[in-house]
Amino acid sequence: MASQLVMYEEEFTKINAVCDRLTKDANAKVVFLVDKNGQLISAAGQTQNIDTTSLASLTAGNVAAMGGLAKLIGEAEFPMQFHQGNQLSLLSAIVGSRVVLVVIFDNRTSQGLVQLRVKKASAELHTIFDALVKKADGPGSGSPFAEISDDDIDNLFSE
């Protein structure tokens, strides 16, 4: 993400609902939504035994590294990546060049079903983030600190 995005409660609730629904619809163990800076936005499913901070950071690093590889071969990016393990597999998808949707699943589901459900969830998330950007760019959406001057801060901390 080029700049920090302000998250409003309404959109945050919608994002969590999409992640919860994806967990159920794809029969996934865990779903994460991470921004490209490595900040965890949402998590759904069996997250108890996962270091979510590390997962978010490593996801962002992986997207950056794969973006570099994509450019080397003439691609803009690899919008979807799949990593298959013995017990668990991981599918990640870039959503609207802003965030990364990460799905961890086992053999109770198939890669095809997960990809299908991720495409649907990605479209929903793209719509939510577009609305969020418009809301943040709208009138009266500037920083709440923009009108505070250095004098105001000095006065606040003076006796």
Kindly give the residue locations of the regions a language model identified.
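Acidic, low-complexity cytosolic segments
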Residues: 2-28, 37, 41-159
